[in-house]
Structures are given as structure tokens and as C-alpha cells.
Amino acid sequence: SGERPWKCCDLQTCTKSIPAFCRCRDLLEQCSDACKECGKVRDSDPPRYICQDVYRGIPAPMCHEHQ
């Protein structure tokens, strides 16, 4: 647990357990300072990154509302 590695996430997958284990697959211009394991997306131009961390706790809100 601790600080969530992302403030919000559109492509989030979480387990149904309590607390949930969540991953965020959003493509980012850069990972947040809270992200411990930041992976570069291969062949991305401009460069994009995914935070590889697994967060245990309350799922993050979505960054963008899907209309």
C-alpha cells in the first residue's frame, strides 16, 4: 500500500479482492515520481512509458470521462 503510483488511470485493471491489487496500463509522457518501476514502451515515437507498479488499495479515478 502507501501512495498510489498514479493520480488517475483510464486503462486500470484491478483484482476483485479487498484490498484490490491494481495496475495501470496508460501510456504516459513520463511516469510520476511515486512510480518505482517505469518501463519504456518499445518503438514508441514520441517516447511513452508505462508504470509497471502494482498498487494495493482503492482503485484510482479515471483521467478522462468516456462520453
Swiss-Prot record:
Domain of life, source organism: Eukaryota
Disulfide bonds: 8-63, 9-24, 14-22, 31-38, 35-51
Marked site (Reactive bond for trypsin) residue numbers: 16-17
Keyword vocabulary terms for this entry: Disulfide bond, Protease inhibitor, Serine protease inhibitor
GO cellular component, one term: extracellular region
CDD domains named among the record's database cross-references: BBI
Molecular function GO labels: serine-type endopeptidase inhibitor activity
Entries under PANTHER family matching the protein: BOWMAN-BIRK TYPE BRAN TRYPSIN INHIBITOR
Record family assignment: Belongs to the Bowman-Birk serine protease inhibitor family.
Protein name: Bowman-Birk type major trypsin inhibitor
